[in-house]
Regions:
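Register position in tetratricopeptide repeats
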Residues: 61, 68, 102-103, 136-137, ...
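Flexible helix-coil transition and linker loops at the boundaries of alpha-helical arrays
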Residues: 39-48, 81-91, 185-197, 294-301
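Start-of-helix register in tetratricopeptide repeats
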Residues: 50, 57, 91, 125, ...
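Canonical tetratricopeptide repeat
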Residues: 54, 95, 129, 162, ...
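Residue-level recognition of tetratricopeptide repeat
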Residues: 57, 64, 98, 132, ...
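Residue signature of alpha-solenoid helical repeat architecture, marking inter-repeat boundaries
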Residues: 46, 50-53, 87, 121, ...
Length: 435
């Protein structure tokens, strides 16, 4: 009963932030003023296509700043109205593609990006959104071509950061880091929005954390928060880093701040894992219940968290049948490597290791340097008694990033030691028999 009251209180607090705002959203004032400005223009002239486009742009920026999906819905209405008045407005069509992308409607996003390109083939941002949509459905070569075309048209924060993301997926972490560093410099020179620069700084911090380089990761997470104090991504990234440093009280505080800005299920799950790590099981349970509560609310808000929930259920060995169904549903519209990874992990947890092997091999196909992927592969091969491959991938997980998870990094280390002991024991027994 106490746990349920806690969940309700958290949700009420979250909704209050959305409905009434907070002093912590002060940096969004400029965007709010732009929204008001365009609304005033439209009251004077309801047929002003440019004002509808400007309003749509400002609403998208607001959605990115605070993570409220309703702003994307409002942006869609404004952009469609702009296109009704001026059907050849390539910018409005491009922005509409971005709205669809943000809602995980990737086919619609790609289709609208292509329409924007037909209207204006010199608009690099349209190629960028097309590449984003293609990337999410696993069409990596086509995504690369779109990003390269964007880069030909504009060397910007947005083109550099997109190429960096693709390079990271392909295992070129040095190239990704170099592109992100350049993206930040170019973005500052061009006076791009603070939220966009902060996003890139957070991404660079995440790249460093993925390699276990905590000092560099900390530098860029803090830089992101200095650029844009309400960067919930940077707050969560810094929370993960503090957990890796065993500064658990700070990690808890940072996760709570991130959740207060945007209640993402993976943030609540990560906070729960920190509580579990330090033996505060009651508070861990509260966060795990919050994950499911957010998942249920997301259905009402038309926000898809299938992947996050499928990972959460599998990681915590709950609702495994439902979790597998969620994971497999991902493949219906999203065939990137992480769709295959979440399916592989859920198949493994449901005792279907042979099928899991096929899926994890697809997840590993790009050469991505992700300790979580390697951990999943190691555990799957371990269950198949493929000891050499299990050792290889568990060792790669720990060498890539020994801090990749507060609980599973330790699980990986224990499994690797067990495998090494069994191999040594088999060798000793073999020598004894030979003697």
């Amino acid at each position: 009963m106490k746990s349920r009251k806690y969940i309700t209180a958290i949700i009420v607090a979250i909704l209050a932030l959305y409905v009434f705002g907070s002093d912590s959203f002060a940096q969004g004032t400029r965007t709010d003023n732009q929204i008001t400005y365009y609304q005033q223009l439209l009251r004077r002239n309801p047929r002003n296509s440019k004002a509808y486009y400007g309003l749509g742009d400002a609403l998208i920026r607001k959605a990115r700043e605070i993570g409220d999906p309703d702003y994307f819905n409002r942006a869609e209405e404004a952009l469609k109205r702009s296109l009704e008045i001026a059907p050849n407005n390539a910018g409005a069509m491009r922005h509409l593609a971005y709205v669809f992308y943000s809602r995980h409607e990737f086919e619609a996003a790609a289709a609208h990006a292509c329409k924007a390109i037909e209207m204006d083939a010199t608009d690099g941002d349209s190629y960028g959104i097309l590449g984003d949509a293609l990337l999410e459905v696993g069409k990596y070569d086509e995504a690369k071509a779109a990003y390269e075309k964007m880069m030909q048209l504009e060397d910007s924060l947005y083109s550099r950061s997109r190429l960096a993301g693709l390079k990271s997926l392909q295992g070129d972490t040095a190239g990704s880091i170099a592109d992100l560093e350049r993206a930040i410099a170019v973005g500052k020179e061009a006076k791009q929005p603070a939220e966009s620069i902060a996003w890139t700084e957070w991404q660079l911090g995440s790249d460093y954390f993925a390699l276990g380089k905590l000092q560099e990761a900390e530098r860029y997470y803090l830089q992101s928060l200095q650029t844009y104090p309400n960067s919930y991504r940077a707050l969560a990234g810094l929370a993960q880093l503090r957990g890796a440093q065993k500064r658990y009280d700070e990690a808890i505080d940072l996760y709570q701040k991130a959740i207060a800005i945007l209640p993402m299920p993976d943030y609540a799950a990560a906070l729960g894992d920190i509580y579990a790590k330090i033996g505060r099981q009651g508070q861990a349970k509260q966060q795990y219940e919050l994950v499911e509560y957010i998942g249920r609310l997301s259905i009402l808000n038309k926000v898809l968290y299938n992947r996050e929930l499928a990972y959460f259920y599998a990681d915590h060995d709950i609702k495994l049948k439902e979790s597998l169904e969620l994971a497999q549903r991902e493949l219906d519209y999203r065939r990137d490597i992480y769709a295959y990874d979440v399916v592989a992990w859920n198949l493994y947890k449901n005792g279907k290791a042979e099928e899991a092997r096929d899926a994890i091999e697809k997840a590993l196909s790009l050469g991505t340097r992700d300790a979580r992927l390697f951990y999943h592969a190691g555990m799957i091969y371990h269950s198949l008694h493929a000891k050499d491959k299990a050792k290889e991938y568990l060792a790669r997980a720990l060498s890539t990033n020994p801090f990749f998870h507060p609980i599973f990094a330790e699980t990986a280390a224990q499994a690797l030691k067990q495998l090494e002991r069994s191999v040594q024991q088999a060798g000793v027994e073999g020598q004894g028999q030979g003697g």
